């Protein structure tokens, strides 16, 4: 919160050794995430109160929202992966929070497809790190702009894995 308030004073904030960057882009999407989360809380209030685990529902919803907000602020591959997986784990549990066979089946299927997507995404990140030697998005961009011709295919392959993993996660 301090970093967001500090940025609103007109400066860009960088924290955690450059892993997190607060700027106008991340502030805008963090606000969108907060508004969406509040809308979900208001829309599901009566339904969530009927659950045995209503406290867990709200805790998981807030965990997913916080990790999505961190994702908008991430500036390296490790932070991106941790934020995506934290969001995913919260969503896996939210899918299976209702105690019935359909909820358990849906949660397990979502977990398995999410694990495959995470593996594909991480494989792309490994290729990207392997060819560039860095995890910072700024440094990766600088490397990609000046990469020798023999690295272009590996960069393209890593991009394909990353897009496939992210696309699979979003689907």
What are these regions (language model features)?
Residues 1-171:
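Alpha-helical transmembrane segments of multi-pass membrane proteins predominantly involved
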């Amino acid at each position: 919160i301090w970093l967001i308030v500090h940025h609103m004073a007109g400066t860009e904030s960088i924290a955690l050794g450059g892993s997190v960057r607060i700027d106008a882009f991340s502030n805008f999407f963090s606000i969108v995430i907060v508004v969406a989360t509040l809308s979900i809380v208001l829309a599901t209030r009566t339904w969530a109160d009927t659950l045995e685990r209503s406290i867990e529902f709200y805790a998981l919803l807030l965990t997913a929202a916080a990790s999505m907000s961190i994702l908008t602020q991430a500036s390296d591959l490790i932070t991106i992966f941790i934020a995506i997986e934290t969001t995913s784990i919260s969503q896996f549990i939210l899918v299976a929070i209702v105690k019935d066979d359909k909820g358990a089946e849906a949660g397990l299927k979502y977990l398995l497809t999410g694990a495959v997507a995470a593996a594909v995404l991480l494989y792309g990140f490994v290729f990207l790190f392997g060819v560039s030697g860095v995890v910072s998005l700024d440094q990766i961009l600088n490397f990609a702009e000046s990469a020798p011709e023999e690295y272009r295919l590996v960069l393209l392959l890593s991009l394909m894995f990353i897009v496939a993993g992210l696309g699979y996660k979003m689907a």
